[in-house]
Structure formats: structure tokens, C-alpha cells
């Protein structure tokens, strides 16, 4: 009897296996987006790419390294994104389990006394026992509905991991830029202190000249105003440093540790002085937001397959095999075997357009994801192109500001000597001090802008997922 039972099961399994190759998922074609094949202002000749460059290979400051490490461990946005990815991974495992039949074992035992009036005048005690294995309501995936849903769940998980990576890149770049602002405020404080000290020295000399009648009280008041201006600039830099540290504390989700390594000056923040874009726009595929958009498109593609499969019959199998007896000792004796096989089929006939509407909606959602993918690529291309052209202009502007700062510093030094010897006037000295300080401040601000641009370009090119270039896993691990 058991042999006769297994034959139809094996035949059904063979047919199901033969039909399981059928799938309704449309063939995936990556959308072609109209962007330039190469980036303007990218003249780098080496083959290094940002995505293959670890953030410790890019940023040079050990203090910044430590802050990034803490942020990747404790930042709430990244932890939320990572937990979302884990939840979707488990959801994918649940969906994948639907591809296979669920096998359950069961055992039952009962002992019952029947009243005498119901048992022909004499009370009777009856027993029954059974054990078995069964498959309950397993739907054969003949037209790929389960596999389409499984593929959609997998792409949803991949999308969540890409979203996590995007948050990762944002944190690395945000911590770097906040740290650069803190370094900038620190150096602006030192510059204001040096200028304040120089102006106080000049003021003391001017006081002597005023007593000697060489300069007027007006000249003295002008120098006092410059001293007050330098003091105000110093206090502004102190405020900016505190605010930058507050921003860093939010990013790392804790107060700044007291044992951080000493920081490097703004001029020594990078190990790589010039980051090439990679010559072609294909480098955009390294960006997590592009990967996330593509996985969303593939998920929508798989949903079309599930909607198509809903038009076809669904076959559900329920079956069991086991043994039963009215005596426990005879439960596994020959002849006490049992089996049951109950297939069912559901054929959609009249759905009043619901299935057609469901398929049309799936196709529309797929087209929406195509548009979203194209928009993501266009936005990514613009991010890189803007960062590259900004880098080109910022480098030229920075070089010009450096020359300007040096020229004004030389001029100030000469006028200070001339002022001491009574050749230059107090007005000449005031103008030279203002010009030199303004040039130094502009050069410092230019340094900050260049550093922020380098951090933005690194992120725009998909860099920052790895700690070191030879890492195979995420930098957060």
C-alpha cells in the first residue's frame, strides 16, 4: 500500500520539477541613461578609484580616523539602517521557505470509556493511537509565482544593504567635513591670536609715537579699533569651534573622548592630493544610491512575474503517511499503515479585471522605478561633475590666494619696518595689517572649502565603504 502511495507522489514530484523551470519574470535590461561617458576636468592619468580606496588610505589625520570609527560604531542612523537590512534578510528567508514543502510529524493517543447504556448494556473502554508525517497545503510553483516573490524579497534585501551603505558613506563624509570645520576654527583662533598680538605690539609703539607727537589721536583710535576687531574674530572662531565639536558629538552619538590623538593641520589632512574620478561615468555604478535604485527596479521586475503567474491555476498538495492502531503495541505492525493524498486546484475564471489591473499596476510601478533609476544616475553624475569642476576652480583660486597672502605678508613686514623708522604713516600700517589679515583669513577659508570638496568628491565617487583599500568587507566590520 505504501509503495502504491509513493508512486503517484514521485510522479507528481517529477512533473513539478519539470514545470518548475517556468518563470514569468520579464528579462531584466539595465536602463540606458543619457550621460556623458567621461567627466570633464578629470585629467588624472593613474588608475586609482575612490571606491577601491579605503578612508584610512585617503584621510591622513589619526584624530579623524578615530572619530570616524566611533561614528560607524555608534551613529543612530547607521544602526537603524543596519537593523532594517537584517530585518529584510530574515523576511527573505521566510519568503524563500515558501519554495519548499513543510513537513510536520504528529502523534495522537486516546483512551475512552463508553457508558453501558450506549454500549449495549455493558460499559466499554476503547483506545486509539496514530503517528504520521504530513505535508500541509504545499502550493506547487508551476508558473514561478513563489520564485518571483522570493526574487522580489531578495532584491528588497539588497536594496536595504545598499541604503545602509549610502548612510555609511554619508557618515564618513559628514564626520570628515565637521572635523575640518573644527580644525579650521582652531587655526582661525590661532590666526586671530597672532594678529591680536601683532596689533598690540604695534599699538604700544604707536602710544610712544603719540606721546612724542609723531602720530595723532585719530591714528591711535584706529589701531584700537583693529585690536577690538581681532578680538571679535577670535571669539567668533571660539564659537565656531564649539559648534563644530557639537556637530561631531551628534555624529558619533557621544561626547568627544578626552583621549583622542592629536590632530593635524588643514594642510596635511589627505594622503592622496588629487583624487581621479576614474575617467568614465561607469564609476557611478559604485555608488550605493545607484545600486539601491537598480535593486528596486529588479524588485519591481520580479513583482511583474508574480502578477503574471496569478493568471494561471494554482495546485495545492496535502498528504500524509503514518500508522494507526487501537493498541499501542500494534501501532507499527504490518497492515496498520495509513496514507492520505488530497490535491486541490484553483483556477481563476471571473475576477472582474482584478488580475489584469494587478499586472498593469505592477508594470506601472516598474516604469516608476525605471524613472527613479534614471534620476538617480543623473543626480550622481551631476554630483561628480559639480565636485570635479569645483575642485578645478578651487585649486586655481587657492593658488592665487596663497600668492596674495604671501605678497601682503611681505608688504606688511616692509611697512612695519618703515613705520618703526618713521618712513610710513600709521594709515599705511593700518591698511597693510587689514589687507594681510584679510588675505590670510581668505586663504584659510579656501583651505577649508578645498577639503570639503575633496570629501564630497570622495563620497560622490562611492568611496568610504572600506577602512583600507585591501579590505574585502565593509569598513564598519
Language-model features, listed with the residues they occupy:
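Short terminal targeting/anchoring segments
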Residues: 216-218, 423-445
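Small/polar, glycine/serine/threonine/aspartate-rich low-complexity segments that form flexible
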Residues: 43-46, 50-59, 108-135, 258-276, ...
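Periplasmic alpha-helical coiled-coil/stalk elements that build and connect Gram-negative outer-membrane
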Residues: 3, 23, 146, 162-279, ...
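Transmembrane beta-barrel architecture of outer-membrane proteins
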Residues: 64-66, 128-130, 177, 222, ...
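Terminal intrinsically disordered/low-complexity segments used for targeting and assembly
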Residues: 2-14, 19-73, 154, 238-285, ...
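A short glycine-centered flexible hinge/capping loop motif at secondary-structure junctions
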Residues: 210-214, 419-423, 460-464
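A glycine-/polar-enriched beta->alpha junction
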Residues: 70-79, 89-101, 133-152, 162-169, ...
Amino acid at each position: 500500500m505504501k509503495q502504491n502511495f509513493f508512486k503517484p507522489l514521485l510522479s507528481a514530484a517529477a512533473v513539478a520539477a519539470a514545470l518548475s523551470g517556468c518563470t514569468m519574470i520579464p528579462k531584466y535590461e539595465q536602463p540606458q541613461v543619457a550621460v556623458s561617458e567621461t567627466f570633464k576636468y578629470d585629467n588624472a592619468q593613474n588608475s586609482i578609484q575612490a571606491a577601491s580606496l579605503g578612508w584610512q588610505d585617503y584621510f591622513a589625520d589619526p584624530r579623524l580616523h578615530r572619530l570616524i570609527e566611533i561614528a560607524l560604531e555608534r551613529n543612530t542612523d547607521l544602526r537603524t539602517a543596519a537593523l532594517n537590512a537584517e530585518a529584510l534578510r530574515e523576511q527573505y528567508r521566510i519568503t524563500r521557505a515558501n519554495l519548499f514543502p513543510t513537513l510536520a510529524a504528529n502523534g495522537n493517543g486516546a483512551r475512552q470509556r463508553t457508558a453501558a447504556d450506549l454500549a449495549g448494556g455493558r460499559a466499554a473502554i476503547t483506545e486509539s493511537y496514530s503517528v504520521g508525517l504530513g505535508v500541509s497545503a504545499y502550493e506547487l510553483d508551476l508558473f514561478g509565482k513563489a520564485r518571483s516573490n522570493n526574487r522580489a524579497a531578495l532584491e528588497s534585501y539588497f536594496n536595504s544593504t545598499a541604503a545602509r551603505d549610502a548612510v555609511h558613506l554619508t557618515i564618513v563624509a559628514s564626520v570628515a567635513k565637521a572635523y575640518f570645520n573644527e580644525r579650521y576654527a582652531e587655526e582661525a583662533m590661532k590666526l586671530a591670536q597672532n594678529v591680536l598680538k601683532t596689533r598690540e605690539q604695534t599699538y604700544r609703539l604707536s602710544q610712544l609715537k603719540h606721546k612724542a607727537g609723531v602720530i595723532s589721536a585719530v591714528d591711535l583710535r584706529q589701531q584700537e579699533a583693529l585690536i577690538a576687531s581681532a578680538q571679535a574674530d577670535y571669539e567668533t572662531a571660539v564659537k565656531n569651534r564649539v559648534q563644530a565639536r557639537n556637530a561631531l558629538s551628534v555624529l558619533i552619538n557621544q561626547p568627544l573622548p578626552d583621549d583622542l590623538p592629536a590632530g593635524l593641520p588643514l594642510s596635511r589632512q589627505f594622503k592622496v592630493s588629487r583624487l581621479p574620478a576614474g575617467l568614465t561615468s561607469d564609476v557611478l555604478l559604485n555608488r550605493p544610491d545607484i545600486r539601491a535604485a537598480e535593486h528596486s527596479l529588479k524588485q519591481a521586475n520580479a513583482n511583474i512575474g508574480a502578477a503574471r503567474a496569478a493568471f494561471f491555476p494554482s495546485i495545492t498538495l496535502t498528504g500524509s503517511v503514518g500508522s494507526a492502531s487501537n493498541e499501542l503495541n500494534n501501532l507499527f505492525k504490518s497492515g496498520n499503515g495509513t496514507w492520505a493524498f488530497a490535491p486541490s486546484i484553483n483556477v481563476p475564471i471571473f475576477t472582474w479585471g482584478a488580475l489584469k489591473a494587478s499586472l498593469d499596476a505592477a508594470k506601472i510601478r516598474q516604469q516608476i522605478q525605471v524613472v527613479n533609476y534614471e534620476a538617480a544616475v543623473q543626480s550622481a553624475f551631476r554630483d561628480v561633475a559639480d565636485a570635479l569642476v569645483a575642485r578645478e576652480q578651487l585649486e586655481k583660486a587657492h593658488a592665487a590666494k596663497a600668492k596674495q597672502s604671501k605678497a601682503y605678508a611681505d608688504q606688511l613686514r616692509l611697512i612695519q619696518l618703515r613705520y618703526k623708522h618713521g618712513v610710513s604713516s600709521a594709515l599705511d600700517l593700518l591698511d597693510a595689517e587689514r589687507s594681510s589679515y584679510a588675505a590670510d583669513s581668505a586663504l584659510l577659508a579656501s583651505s577649508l572649502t578645498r577639503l570639503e570638496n575633496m570629501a564630497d568628491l570622495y563620497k560622490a565617487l562611492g568611496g568610504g565603504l572600506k577602512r583600507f583599500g585591501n579590505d574585502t568587507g565593509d569598513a564598519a566590520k
